Curated annotation (Swiss-Prot):
It comes from Arabis hirsuta (Hairy rock-cress). The keyword Methyltransferase does not apply. Keywords: Chloroplast, Plastid, Ribonucleoprotein, Ribosomal protein, RNA-binding, rRNA-binding. GO terms for biological process: translation. Pfam families: Ribosomal_S18. GO terms for cellular component: chloroplast; mitochondrial small ribosomal subunit. This is Small ribosomal subunit protein bS18c. InterPro entries: Ribosomal_bS18, Ribosomal_bS18_CS, Ribosomal_bS18_sf. It is found in: Plastid, Chloroplast. Residues 1-19 have a biased composition (Basic residues). GO terms for molecular function: small ribosomal subunit rRNA binding; structural constituent of ribosome. Residues 1-20 are annotated as: Disordered.
């Protein structure tokens, strides 16, 4: 078949490349809390390399920095602050718990 007469040709769309999360000037260090906190989930877990969109070497450095910051108590190991919302506080009723004799 002739190349000029292809029935299904897809047009090449241009796409914007995402900016890398770590710039070349950023230093991956346990003291750089603004950088480290971007790679931790709300539960306090280290996000995966696929989610972070970083290279393998950068992910290893981030992981080591996070673990060092946790050991030095700059970061919590778990971020499990459960927030319960109550619309109205109701007092406990003790009259329902009467013993029958």
């Amino acid at each position: 078949m002739n190349k000029s007469k292809r029935p299904f040709t897809k047009s090449k769309r241009s796409f914007r490349r995402r900016l890398p999360p770590i710039q070349s000037g950023d230093r991956i260090d346990y003291r750089n809390m603004s950088l480290i906190s971007r790679f931790i989930s709300e539960q306090g877990k280290i996000l995966s390399r696929r989610v972070n969109r970083v290279t393998l070497k950068q992910q290893r450095l981030i992981t080591m920095a996070i673990k060092q910051a946790r050991i030095l108590s700059l970061l919590p190991f778990l971020n499990n602050q459960k927030q319960f919302e109550r619309s109205e506080s109701t007092p406990r009723t003790t009259s329902l718990r009467t013993r029958k004799k």
